[in-house]
């Protein structure tokens, strides 16, 4: 379990963040599909979760408020990728997402892996750019023509979601 501080309150003439405890759990077994279901509709690319993903949830006050998966980074030995990060809308904007993925990334890094996250979400990009825990390693727009010779191009032809024509930002976790 990992403690996460977030949120705001006004005290003595300045804004301060109250402590919000969010516990992080790895989800295993039969609960995998059930846990992802309420988050699926809030993900900007599609509603699918990689079947091989390790799943983690953030729980605040008895409510599951955040979800992410961790998958093998394609074609890169020793690397894992944060996959399908979602914070429920009522809990967005107070720092839960970044602290949640920091806790998950720290766990994965402690297992000997490098960790990557690629996103197009402006708020997450801004937060990670200002974080000492993440290094921006790539930014740009992926064009469909760039994908045609790659092994996963067939997945796109079958209707898989992608970030083509969106500004994307890729970050590496630095423990």
Language-model features: locations:
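Conserved acetyl-CoA-binding loop-helix of GNAT-fold acetyltransferases
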Residues: 87, 92-106
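Conserved GNAT acetyl-CoA-binding A-motif
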Residues: 106-123
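Conserved catalytic-core motifs of GNAT/GCN5-like acyltransferases
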Residues: 134-157
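A conserved mid-domain beta-alpha-beta active-site/ligand-binding segment of alpha/beta enzyme cores
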Residues: 155-175
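Conserved N-terminal entry element of GNAT/NAT acetyltransferase domains
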Residues: 1-29
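A conserved beta-strand-loop-helix scaffold within acyl/acetyltransferase catalytic domains
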Residues: 25-91
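A short acidic (Asp/Glu
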Residues: 126-130
């Amino acid at each position: 379990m990992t403690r996460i501080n977030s949120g705001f309150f006004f005290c003595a003439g300045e804004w301060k963040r109250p402590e919000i405890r969010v516990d992080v759990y790895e989800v295993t077994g039969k609960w995998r599909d059930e846990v992802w279901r309420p988050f699926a509709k809030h993900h900007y690319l599609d509603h699918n979760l990689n079947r091989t993903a390790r799943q983690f949830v953030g729980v605040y006050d008895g409510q599951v408020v955040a979800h992410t998966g961790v998958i093998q980074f394609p074609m890169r030995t020793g690397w894992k990728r944060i996959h399908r990060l979602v914070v429920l809308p009522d809990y967005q904007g107070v720092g839960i997402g970044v602290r949640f993925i920091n806790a998950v990334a720290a766990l994965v890094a402690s297992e000997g892996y490098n960790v990557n996250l690629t996103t197009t979400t402006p708020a997450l990009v801004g937060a990670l750019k200002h974080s000492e825990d993440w290094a921006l390693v790539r930014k740009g727009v992926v064009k469909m023509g760039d994908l045609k010779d790659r092994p996963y191009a067939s997945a796109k032809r079958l209707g898989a979601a992608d970030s083509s024509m969106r500004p994307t930002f890729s970050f590496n976790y630095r423990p």
